[in-house]
Amino acid sequence: MLSSKLFCVLFFCLGLSNGWPQFDFMNQMGFGGGFNNGPHPNSRPGSRPNSPLGDIFGNINGMVKGITDQIGKIAQGLDVNNDLGKMAHGPPPPQSEWVEHARRFCRRFPGHPKCRGQLPQFNDIGSMLNGILVDSGKWLPKVPFINIRDPLSGINSDLKNALNGIQVQFGQISQQFANNIRNICQQMNCKQQQQKNVQMKQAILKQTVDFEKKVFGNNVADKMNLRFDRTLQLKQALLEKAQLKGVVAPEDNGVFDKDLLLTETQANFMLNELGKGGEGAIPMPGSAKAKRASIFFEQNLIQKWPSTSPIPYTFDSSLDNLDQNDVRGAISEIEQKTCIRFKYFASPPKGNHINYQKVNSPSFCGLSYIGRVEPANPVYLSFQCGNGRGIAVHETMHALGVNHQHLRMDRDKHIKVDWSNINPQQYDAFVVADSKLYTTYGVKYAYDSIMHYNAYTGAVNIAKPTMIPLVNQQANIGLLGQRAKMSNADVEILNKMYCKSAGCDDKNVYCGAWALQDLCNNPNHNVWMRSNCRKSCNFC
């Protein structure tokens, strides 16, 4: 097994090839509490005169190839694309080995032109892999159709009009903003996939496959690859919606919005919102019949943890005592400020639970799913970004069902996104979340939310912010991305999600938006709001 030290060195080295490994990622994410959320230094660490770090980095860089080869061997067999990519740089393999890889590729991409009627040959390897990063969706199994309920169907026209300027069509940006992104791509290569993205996805894949095989006895390599493929397909669809298809290839790192893992159901829902329902080669088993969906938290309790019993959690053996203390501190903060309770298990229990795992990687600070997922919620933490407790709070809140603050449907009323300075390949980190998926519950926007990203997230010019507060800019820009503690707004939203009595709920995802416009007690809507928006309006 690859040692934790080897993992650490591997990801550190990969970061070096793209600038400043720690400042570039952690500070922009807002997770590196030690960097004060300010502009980046204007010299790369280790390049200063007489700095011993320069020699150290040089020696580490010399180790990259050998380490990369090692992790490739360890992850071999989990991702056929990765295997084929390595195979393309060597001599033809034995025919039996090639046939196995070709079959796996065609099972994963049944619509690929080289998989129609016969298996591809080794000399087809270039065309097999070409285009996957730009438009892989048409070769994957079909995205199932989902009949998504319109939450505004039958709603009073005044309430509909109240959403003008707030309700944003998922993935839509102005032509001017799209042109800003195109201009960036004239100055940088927006289609090249960085090696750190490939390695990050392989590390997550291996960690997940090992966990589910160990705990549940399941081999989930194919399932995880489809999740990653759907995540990439979603990123591609968002770029297409912004008329950036063919201009930008998104980061193929297995995650969405920098630290979110998506289930296939979540990805399929958003793909349907982007008009991709039915796209693909052949129907997925059992997907011929269109499904009715409403993923809004109040109406889809599969994503919510039961409030009647403590949430089970456990630690992977990869966490040392200090790491465990950080997570316990995070859990303690949530318990002290809300009604939510957790229960520790020394070994993974049967059924749903949160499993905290350590991945020694400065390529990310933490990763999590949103809401409860089957069969368990892995939370991946690197403990290399400063303030491990605050990062654990952030990722645990994702597991509880909370999305990022800066992606709220009303975010453009509170921050300005500088589209002329964002990394185009990280476009998904700036797209306002699907308004049918998440509600604000009437909680005001909070610059100091522990769920907000840093002001310099995804910046091309890392001396300039990508997110600028529209209120009291000088004071609030330093609050963005703080990981010191939960804000009052973070506490309020968890209490509304989990700590209200039975029957205290919202019946419409836009209740929170209406509540923030003081429509709860409006004489024209009071009766309807009392019946349908009890939680967001604080009527219970």
Swiss-Prot record:
Residues holding Zn(2+): 394, 398, 404
Cofactor(s), names only, from the UniProt record: Zn(2+)
PANTHER family listed in its UniProt record: DISCOIDIN, CUB, EGF, LAMININ , AND ZINC METALLOPROTEASE DOMAIN CONTAINING, ZINC METALLOPROTEINASE NAS-10
InterPro entries xrefs: Astacin-like_dom (IPR034035), MetalloPept_cat_dom_sf (IPR024079), Peptidase_M12A (IPR001506), Peptidase_M12A_astacin-9/10/11 (IPR017368), Peptidase_Metallo (IPR006026), ShKT_dom (IPR003582)
Enzyme Commission numbers on file: 3.4.24.-
Domain annotation ShKT: ranges: 504-540
Catalytic residues (UniProt): 395
Organism: Caenorhabditis elegans
Intrachain disulfide bonds: 339-499, 365-385, 504-540, 511-533, 520-537
Protein's GO biological process: proteolysis
Top class in the EC scheme: hydrolase
Cofactor binding mode and count: Binds 1 zinc ion per subunit.
Descriptive protein name: Zinc metalloproteinase nas-10
Molecular function via GO: metalloendopeptidase activity; zinc ion binding
Domain of life: Eukaryota
One Pfam family per UniProt: ShK
Domain Peptidase M12A: from-to ranges: 293-500
Record's keyword terms, sorted: Disulfide bond, Hydrolase, Metal-binding, Metalloprotease, Protease, Zinc, Zymogen
Functional summary from the UniProt entry: Metalloprotease.
